[in-house]
């Protein structure tokens, strides 16, 4: 099958388009300190950032969603993260040039993430990023790995799904794509 030029490019956010690990690790460590625990090395947290709050709470506090304190701790983590959303978060190296080139070529690009919409949109605004479409984990009834978010993004762009490239860093991205 010959490689075709895409009509749009969609990116996962955390760990793909943006290096959010420093701010997410700092927020998890603040929560750990509040809970009387020692901070974890950021390098130990980084591999789990793509798993969102659930994954970070699992490695940082050893709790899962069935734990009675999970929701309260998740809410506290997200509040801490919201306070420090874009302190150290940046585009991964080279992606600033890629985004500029996509804009220059008038090739639409967007974000499809499982991150909550409020955090996603504030983060994109803080970094002065203006994707053509943004689909977040709480925008639809089903998030990735279900394909609905990608199909919804294609619909918003008015493009056939098979004319769009999707770039992600996790198995859920592959399954969704």
How should each PLM-predicted stretch be described?
Residues 2, 112, 142:
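Residue-level marker of regulatory loop/turn positions in helix-turn-helix DNA-binding domains and
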């Amino acid at each position: 099958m010959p490689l075709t030029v895409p009509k749009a490019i969609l990116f996962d956010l955390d760990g793909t388009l943006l290096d959010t690990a420093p701010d997410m690790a700092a927020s998890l460590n603040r929560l750990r300190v509040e809970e009387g625990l020692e901070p974890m090395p950021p390098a130990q947290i980084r591999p789990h950032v793509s798993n969102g709050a659930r994954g970070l709470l699992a490695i940082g506090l050893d709790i899962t969603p069935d734990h009675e304190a999970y929701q309260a701790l998740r809410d506290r983590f997200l509040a801490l993260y919201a306070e420090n959303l874009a302190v150290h978060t940046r585009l991964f190296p080279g992606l600033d040039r890629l985004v500029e080139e996509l804009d220059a070529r008038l090739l639409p690009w967007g974000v499809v993430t499982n991150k909550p919409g409020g955090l996603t949109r504030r983060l994109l605004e803080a970094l002065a990023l203006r994707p053509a479409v943004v689909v977040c984990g709480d925008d639809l009834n089903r998030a990735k790995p279900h394909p609905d978010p990608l199909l919804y993004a294609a619909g918003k762009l008015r493009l056939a799904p098979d004319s769009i490239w999707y770039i992600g860093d996790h198995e859920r991205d592959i399954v969704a794509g």
